[in-house]
From Swiss-Prot:
Its main location: membrane. Required for the insertion and/or proper folding and/or complex formation of integral membrane proteins into the membrane. Involved in integration of membrane proteins that insert both dependently and independently of the Sec translocase complex, as well as at least some lipoproteins. Aids folding of multispanning membrane proteins. This is Membrane protein insertase YidC. It holds the Pfam family YidC_periplas. Residues 34-72 are annotated as: Disordered. Belongs to the OXA1/ALB3/YidC family. Type 1 subfamily.
Length: 578
């Protein structure tokens, strides 16, 4: 088997993979309307009922017991939202039901040129619906009332985490039929005080509190009526079918946008919107979590550990997609008090914090089928960054370490290529001698390989072994929120998007051309022409790929050129002295 043909097959496989990713960019997901891109937390929701956007989607008593479909009941929406602000979150709570209807991530600007505009995670405007709902349903649950969801009252209309304050508590109160309810939100300081402003700006994981993006939600039920109160806690995430704003602004490749749940059989089960279009998902689980995923960010409800919950996904009558759960029945005797709680995570996909919150939640950082290789690569990259403080230089350092790890394999590949280059005149002579008799030509080639002690697969197999590492690193750079808006130097201000001036892809094409010059020339003229086109083809596709990935490829090629040049010259020198 001709070594160049093997390399060509590998190269074409890579190009085919990149073609699929590029196709996803162009056809995988529609653009998000511009009007939904911004979030204004100072503007309340419409003060009139709207069947298209104000359905409560509250599980009924029947659904909490048996998992049947929730009711879609239009309710009035209050015109005054409760504003809450910490050092990492800027959000709004609707007193009608106590849902979080708007949420911006202060440490993650939507665009680099607008650092004062936070990325909008939750929104309930005209163009986009995405919110976190929770409440009490069941026999006596106030959210199951035919009059609509409860209208809570708060002591203030706005709350802000003060300097030196590590926790902010927001209480919403409601009373009905002798039962007093308090819906309590607990927010936490996100950034550690002992970190410098520079370290905070670099978003070092060591400077982010593990509960920075966790919101504690608890219900205090004080039953002062003359009978036993009965109900169920529910929580759900509701989102419309709009595109992912983080994906359309960050990179040209479409990533997963949809729901995911934890089940006993699968610690990370994805349920896409297409799945919800076809059928509902229902399963009884103990503990676990339900989540909605998008590029770089995730929202998840995490119930109390050890309790049995009914997990479900479905599509409501307004075309919104819902993933959530209903808890076990709570009974509060007359004159008694009960508290039940859960946790909402709304923020970036920080693997360490997600894993600590609930097992399997870190898998929402979806590295694909090579996750078992990608996770150690990210772990190493993150530790390098903790020392260097720049993700670009960290990628370069990681590339050097990976190259050192594969040095023996690469050396074997380059030695095989060098030997092939040395015997290329003999290979050309065999081709001319046997002409169109391919069987005799193949036999003569195999005899030549045996005589010269050349393994025709020696240059291809090491490359194949390294391909999973390359693909894993691709997903690490694509999926890790740490790369989002991370600068390197000069013109590279965001490693997660394409090079704005295409300098790195052009340099990469140049390094591939140099590598090609060091390789033996294919005996087949047509094959030689195709190989000459490979640097151009790769350069074209890499024009739109994340600068961080292209940086890795450029550095890897430069190291490969140096290694290949050294080995080739060494073998040629030995051949001359022999």
């Amino acid at each position: 088997m001709d070594i160049q043909r093997s390399i060509l097959i590998v190269a074409l496989a890579v190009v085919s993979y990149l073609l699929v990713l590029q196709w996803n960019k162009d056809y995988g997901q529609p653009e998000l309307p511009a009007a939904s891109a911004s979030m204004n937390t100072t503007q309340g929701l419409p003060d009139t009922p709207s069947a298209s956007g104000t359905s409560s989607d509250v599980p009924t008593a029947q659904s909490s017991a048996a998992g049947s479909e929730a009711a879609d009941k239009p309710v009035a929406v209050s015109d005054k939202l409760i504003q809450v602000k910490t050092d990492v979150l800027d959000l709004a709570i609707d007193p009608r039901g106590g849902d979080i209807v708007q949420l911006g991530l202060l440490q993650y600007p939507r665009r680099l040129d607008r650092p004062d505009v936070p990325f909008p995670l939750f929104d309930n405007g005209r163009e986009r619906t995405y919110l976190a709902q929770s409440g009490l349903t069941g026999a006596d649950g106030p959210d199951a009332s035919s009059a609509g969801r409860p209208l809570f009252h708060s002591a203030q209309s706005s709350y802000q985490l003060a300097d030196g304050q590590n926790e902010l508590v927001v209480d919403l109160s409601f009373s009905h039929d002798g039962v007093n309810y308090i819906k309590r939100f607990t927010f936490h300081r996100g950034l550690k005080a002992d970190c410098s402003d520079k370290e905070k700006a670099q978003k070092k994981i060591e400077c982010i509190n593990e509960n920075a993006y966790q919101v504690g939600v608890s219900y205090l039920i004080d039953n002062q009526s003359g009978k036993t109160w009965s109900g169920n806690l529910f929580a759900q995430l509701k989102r419309d079918g709009s595109a992912d704003p983080s994906s359309t602004t960050a990179t040209g490749v479409s990533t997963y946008l949809g729901a995911a749940v934890w089940t006993p059989d699968s610690p990370y089960k994805k349920i896409s919107t297409k799945d919800m279009d076809k059928e509902q998902f229902k399963e009884s689980v103990q503990g676990g979590w339900v989540a909605w995923l998008q590029h770089y960010f995730v929202t998840a409800w995490v119930p109390t550990k050890g309790e049995q919950h009914q997990v479900m996904t479905r599509k409501d009558g307004q075309g919104n997609y819902i993933v959530g759960f209903t808890g076990p029945t709570l009974s509060v005797p007359a004159g008694s008090k009960v508290e039940t709680d859960l946790t909402l995570y709304a923020g970036p996909k920080l693997q360490k914090h997600l894993k600590e919150l609930s097992p399997g939640l870190e898998l929402t950082v979806d590295y694909g089928f090579l996750w078992f290789i990608a996770q150690p690569i990210f772990w190493l990259l993150q530790h390098i960054h903790s020392l260097i403080g720049n993700w670009g230089w960290s990628i370069i350092a990681l590339t050097v370490l990976i190259k050192l790890a594969f040095f023996p394999l690469s050396a074997a590949s380059y030695r095989s290529m060098a030997r092939m280059r040395a015997v290329s005149p003999k290979m050309q002579a065999i081709k001319e001698q046997h002409g169109d008799d391919r069987q005799k030509m193949s036999q003569a080639m195999m005899e030549l390989y045996k005589k010269e002690k050349i393994n025709p697969l020696g240059g291809c197999l090491p490359i194949l072994v390294q391909m999973p590492v390359f693909l894993s690193l691709y997903w690490v750079l694509l999926e890790s929120v740490e790369m989002r808006q991370a600068p390197w130097l000069g013109w590279i201000t965001d490693l997660s998007v394409k090079d704005p001036f295409f300098i790195l892809p052009i340099v990469m094409g140049g390094t591939m051309l140099i590598q090609q010059m060091l390789n033996p020339t294919p005996p087949d003229p047509m094959q030689a022409k195709v190989m000459k086109l490979m640097p151009i083809i790769f350069t074209f596709f890499f024009l739109w790929f994340p600068a961080g990935l292209v940086l890795y490829w450029v550095v890897n090629n430069c190291l490969s050129i140096a290694q290949q040049w050294y080995i080739t010259r060494k073998i040629e020198a030995a051949a001359k002295t022999a």
